[in-house]
Amino acid sequence: MVKLVEVLQHPDEIVPILQMLHKTYRAKRSYKDPGLAFCYGMLQRVSRSFSVVIQQLPDELRHPICVFYLILRALDTVEDDMNLPNEVKIPLLRTFHEHLFDRSWKLKCGYGPYVDLMENYPLVTDVFLTLSPGAQEVIRDSTRRMGNGMADFIGKDEVHSVAEYDLYCHYVAGLVGSAVAKIFVDSGLEKENLVAEVDLANNMGQFLQKTNVIRDYLEDINEEPAPRMFWPREIWGKYAQELADFKDPANEKAAVQCLNHMVTDALRHCEIGLNVIPLLQNIGILRSCLIPEVMGLRTLTLCYNNPQVFRGVVKMRRGETAKLFMSIYDKRSFYQTYLRLANELEAKCKGEASGDPMVATTLKHVHGIQKSCKAALSSKELLAKSGSALTDDPAIRLLLLVGVVAYFAYAFNLGDVRGEHGVRALGSILDLSQKGLAVASVALLLLVLLARSRLPLLTSASSKQ
């Protein structure tokens, strides 16, 4: 639940939080089918953010993407379970795709909600078998290639080169981007050129995966019974003898320099991946792709030059997440937000990290991102569709007006305030009107939020941008 102190410290995030809570509530659909009920319930447990993101998709794409996501999380659970010996894990990864059509197959492994996912995996299979043959084949092929790629890296104690690091991220995330693009095109909601530009979707996936690898350093290095080491020696070897050395506060300077090097490496995928945005046409698909990219860049901005990565968890506040989520509703809003985040990263580079050995290369990538965003914002397509800013939205203006009126009505009813102005209290009648106004204000606030959550611009999955 959102912490009250955080909300009070950031009042501008209150409305986005309420909107996000409303969307989360809507995402908890009641499905009579046991398989669908399990899949969407499990999706809520393993990734609340993706559960909301998936609701942006057109109806015909939600089930395939939901099932695809859970299948890959199950595959990832096998890879991440360090209690499984390699002689068991490797064959499981290489043959995982063969069990997609087996209604009886399940496995005991993982932790937390993933134990339930693996033990009740036949319910996922039930839904998978209802998908179109085309979607089934895309998912099966992607799972086969990913499982074999994961298996190739299991026998290695560490990732040695940046090229190996790129390959691993391609297997576990880049392939997903390409497969999802194929599902979008096969649905008829996107054009063939989205699949033709396979490297763009691959880079979007690699960017998000590298963001997770960077953020999860401490969790991975402390994994029992053996650490998971995805940072490539080619990078960290320049700053330490062992990857685990970065946990020692005495090595903070070297650790942060290595961290900045890793962030810089991830940014090169961000530059390339941006080129996929102009190809997306369906507004629901667009939002489902844009929101994770924004969250990824914000996470990198928080991690950059931040020693907290080696001490604990670095993540966005719930309110900030909600604010970013609700601010992305079309290409223009995406580029505006992305440019702002790139500007924040540039400021960190030129300020607190100005002496970093990699800062020139970091800035080169940041400037590339800024250039792409500015070019897109000045394009004829987006200028023609620029519309009003969020603060000019009638619903927002009404919301602010209600808030101001309610506040001053309340303040004026306070004895001290009335006394200063020589106004006599009207007793219970005024108290009653005050309560009525408060109730009406809250009701109108909820109506405004509900209306905004149903605006075609934000939720129409079938309209075209």
Curated annotation (Swiss-Prot):
Compartments where found: Membrane
Gene Ontology, cellular component aspect: endoplasmic reticulum membrane
Residues annotated to bind Mg(2+): D76, E79, D80
Membrane-topology annotation of the record: Multi-pass membrane protein
EC top class, as a word: oxidoreductase
Function, as annotated: Produces squalene when coexpressed with SSL-1 and bisfarnesyl ether and a very small amount of squalene when incubated alone in the presence of NADPH.
Entry-linked NCBIfam families: squal_synth (TIGR01559)
Family recorded in the similarity comment: Belongs to the phytoene/squalene synthase family.
Record-given protein name: Botryococcus squalene synthase
